[in-house]
Amino acid sequence: MEREPENGEPAEIKIIKEAYEKAFMFVNKGLNTDELGQKEEAKNYYKQGIGHLLRGISIAAAEPGHTGPAWEAARQMQQKMKETLQNVRTRLEILEKGLATSLRNDLQDVPKLYPEFPPKDACKKSPEQESVSTAPQRAEVDGSASAACAGPSGAPSALPVPSPSCPAEAPPAYSPQAAEGHYTVSYGTDSGEFSSVGEDFYRNRSQPPPLETLGLDADELILIPNGVQIFFVNPAGEVSAPSYPGYLRIVRFLDNSLDTVLNRPPGFLQVCDWLYPLVPDRSPVLKCTVGAYMFPDTMLQAAGCFVGVVLSSELPEDDRELFEDLLRQMSDLRLQANWNREEDEFQIPGRSSHPSEPPKEASGTDVRQSSSSGSSIDQGSKDARHKGKRGKKTKDSSEEVNLSQIVPCEPSSEEKSKELPEWSEKVAHNILSGASWVSWGLVKGAEFTGKAIQKGASKLRERIQPEEKPVEVSPAVTRGLYIAKQATGGAAKVSQLLVDGVCTVANCVGKELAPHVKKHGSKLVPESLKRDKDGKSALDGAMVVAASSVQGFSTVWQGLECAAKCIVNNVSAETVQTVRYKYGHNAGEATHNAVDSAINVGLTAYNIDNIGIKAMVKKTAKQTGHTLLEDYQIVERPQRESQGGATSTEGRRDIGKQVEEEKPGAGKKDK
């Protein structure tokens, strides 16, 4: 915000500016100390900021005599101070009532994800010594002196001791029962299994902090209360064991104007005690072919650290779809390309594959490679499909778990790469080259027509004898024509805005309908049309020809549009100039307004015709067809070029680009 010279500013504006600067200085200090958990100091800063906010708001800036850019800027500052005052008061009330602490302190109070196991020496002790020695340790794990461990009843209920030969089981890993399982950390004995932690450990599941602690403008877009696990990858490529299933939520801040002031992102992802800021088109996210979502670990200062998020198969399908849709909107989500290499499938830490098993034909990717290597992100792929096979159970009941089996990333597909018939490519290239030539010819023809109109008008003016006395045009008529020009111009702009809105809605609806039409429409096509005797897809060849036809029609339509504008501009300009030459300046100006009004009326009528329900349905169907044909458009340069100086398809497309550059800049109105 630019500041005017203070010598000419009223005292009230100076007071408002001073209060504005001091208020936000104290509010920012309060936010910083609040994030560090220093409540009392944060409350003092908030109170000082509220005092300056009230002082700045108390100045009356809406008086009738207070006009000008300086007062307008002061009113904007007061409006911002009012909004900030409401948020600061709400946060101060929360701090004074002790309802919540800062988000970071809440996350530090989450119970430990990994309990402390009893020492291995306990296996060598007698049952009597076991019951006495393990009680304090279990009480320490539980975090409180539970009756089962410390009370008198805890000693008689001594549990069997595991044999020293029994190996310790690996940390908890992701399994098909992740939504309900992983709430026991146990080790086997001769008579069964028993938990190494108390019941309180299972009851005290981590819960997300209250949404009120984030401010009044925080909006929770999705909350999955349980069934989400995370694992960590360090710069050396080592992968940690997955965490216990916990909650996941995505929060968005509604007031974007405060993002810069409060130094916060537009939204964030929270999985238990891990946070990740979400900035549209900037926050990188990789969806692996094995179903895990990989994020850079921004909570650690070290570079090369990553976090994987795994959703349980027991979660509703709607939750998974909503989660991925939100990631597409609020981050830069990429899909991992298929890796056609024979290597071990993705292994959850703690599960080992057995060398006796035959190698699997899989295209899975180790998460350490996919997360630490930037080359694994496919920049252009939107259809990454997984072709992995399921893990097998061995005789000792240890199971190799493949995440792609549990959380499908994309529906598996066994389709081979589609080969197009030669005739389809030839026809498509001929259509595109022909359309480019037609468009170029239309524009060039319009240019020659415009020059002919100019020459003809010049010769006509040479034969016309100007009037000795310019024609007097009534001021009322001149004023009426000018008003008509302005009114029709406004109507044309408004109708164009309405048409743009209808087109935007139709485009969105068409893009949403296209995948469903493609999915269900392919089921209606007979197999005989999908493949010919040579194994080539005749249907895909027809789709390529159709896509090229659409491209060619668009090119010709642009040429027609450009040619029409060129001719209309020349006719209008020469008509006005001829009338001005014959009847004087006033008559020429009236003619100019009348011609512009007629053009505006025509554009308005054309736009209104494209606003109705029928036009909406047409545009939706057209956009659906265009979206279906996007995958079949020819974008590569053809390898065969005719000899003898013949122009290739790519060269003709360059001519089409020149057509766009040669459009006259003095166009009246754009349809």
UniProtKB/Swiss-Prot annotation:
Renumbered to this chain, the Basic residues biased-composition regions fall at: 384-393
On the tree of life, the source organism's domain of life is: Eukaryota
Domain Senescence, first and last residues per copy: 431-615
Q: Where is the composition biased (Pro residues)?
A: 159-174
Modification type N-acetylmethionine: residues: M1
User: One of this protein's Pfam families, by short name?
Assistant: Senescence
Mind telling me how this protein is modified after translation?
Answer: Ubiquitinated; ubiquitination does not require ITCH and WWP1.
Q: What is its main location?
A: cytoplasm
Q: Where is this region: Disordered?
A: 110-175, 346-421, 635-671
Expression tissues: Brain (at protein level).
The record's Gene3D superfamilies line, in alphabetical order, gives: Phosphotransferase system, lactose/cellobiose-type IIA subunit
Instruction: Describe the protein's quaternary organization and the partners it interacts with.
Output: Interacts with ITCH and WWP1. Interacts (via MIT domain) with IST1; leading to the recruitment of SPART to midbodies. Interacts with MAP1LC3A and MAP1LC3C.
**Any idea what this protein is called?**
Spartin
Specify the species.
Mus musculus (Mouse)
Q: What is the lineage of its organism?
A: Eukaryota, Metazoa, Chordata, Craniata, Vertebrata
